[in-house]
């Protein structure tokens, strides 16, 4: 695989359909998409992000989510998910460069990124699908992992068939349409994991969906 420097230039990615691993789902895994220098630049930048642990309302009670997060995006790309309305913060330097890299390499035209930081294996994300109405229909969602390896588990809504996809630092997972219509996904707890993991999930939203 050709890897290039910190400038996030295009390169010839080793890409394969996850179906080659027996996973019959519209996902594409690119192992080692980011090199060590690129990962380090992003991790250093994450330390400056205004990460929060918001509360969501579930079954009549408020619960803090089991991770910290921040939403960055273009002007007019505010986001409502899990009952939380968040205003888009301005793009950080290296997250913005990564967005441009995804556009050059795969034609992904994201205008926002949700950053989730998992402090260790105690932090997690429950079953869900990224099907909010402000996400542009049939658009791809790109997910980049940095730090500790974690399992990404997908579950078919109709058959309940599950597949586990281990994601390692620097890996890129692209979820193609109709992934969000037919599948759910989660990041389960892994108590033996002691190191942090950061995930960047790039999405394309309908601009000004929630007004000016």
Description of each model-found segment:
Residues 1-212:
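Non-heme Fe(II) oxygenase metal-center motifs and adjacent flexible, charged/small-residue loops
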């Amino acid at each position: 695989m050709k890897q290039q420097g910190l400038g996030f230039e295009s390169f010839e990615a080793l890409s394969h359909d996850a179906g080659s691993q027996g996973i019959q789902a519209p996902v594409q895994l690119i192992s080692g998409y980011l090199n060590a220098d690129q990962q380090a630049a992003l991790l250093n930048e994450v330390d400056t992000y205004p990460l929060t642990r918001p509360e969501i309302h579930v079954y009549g009670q408020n619960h803090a989510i089991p991770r910290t997060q921040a939403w960055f995006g273009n002007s007019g790309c505010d986001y409502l998910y899990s009952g939380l309305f968040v205003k888009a913060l301005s793009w950080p330097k290296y997250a913005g460069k990564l967005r441009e890299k995804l556009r050059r390499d795969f034609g992904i035209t994201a205008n926002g990124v949700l950053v989730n930081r998992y402090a260790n294996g105690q932090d997690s994300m429950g079953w869900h699908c990224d099907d909010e109405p402000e996400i542009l229909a049939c658009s791809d969602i790109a997910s980049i992992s940095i730090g500790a390896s974690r399992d990404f588990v997908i579950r078919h809504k109709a058959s309940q068939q599950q597949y586990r996809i281990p994601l390692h630092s620097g890996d890129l997972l692209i979820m193609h349409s109709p992934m969000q219509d037919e599948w759910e996904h989660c990041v389960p707890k892994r108590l033996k994991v002691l190191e942090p993991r950061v995930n960047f999930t790039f999405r394309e939203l309908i601009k000004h969906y929630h007004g000016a």
